[in-house]
Amino acid sequence: MLRKLAIAAGVIGAMAISGGAQAQNGFRLCNLSSINLEVAKALNTGNKDPAGRPIIISEGWYQFAKGECAVLWSGKLQYRYYLLYGQAKEANKEWKGDIPICVSRQPFTITSDLCPPDKYRRMFFQVDTGENDGWTQNLRD
């Protein structure tokens, strides 16, 4: 019996140290790369505008020093899929995917699928958080 308790305690301790993908409520991002980076986030709300286009909310830029973690969406996760794009301009490196989302060179919040002429698109990657209340996404070299 004591051996089973010791094993269970060891497993629980290992899970706490590893910072598992579902450690706390909210969506947390950690920069585990060796360089500073900036991140844009986006969310397809599932709603449509009056013209029938999807309402996608994108925001940026969030600055992350190497080793830094921060919450991008707080509280219990309301959606299954979240979109991210990361870049380190000085290192000419990107964390990207295949979903085009509108961004701006300056800090921004865009609430449309349309991309005005003074904005541009970057290729975001999708994070599937499953049915979890919280998620930690790590960006690595």
Question: Could you say what each language-model-derived stretch is?
Answer:
Residues G20-K66, V71-L77, Y85-D141:
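Intrinsically disordered, low-complexity segments enriched in small/polar residues
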Residues A8-A16:
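Bacterial N-terminal signal peptides
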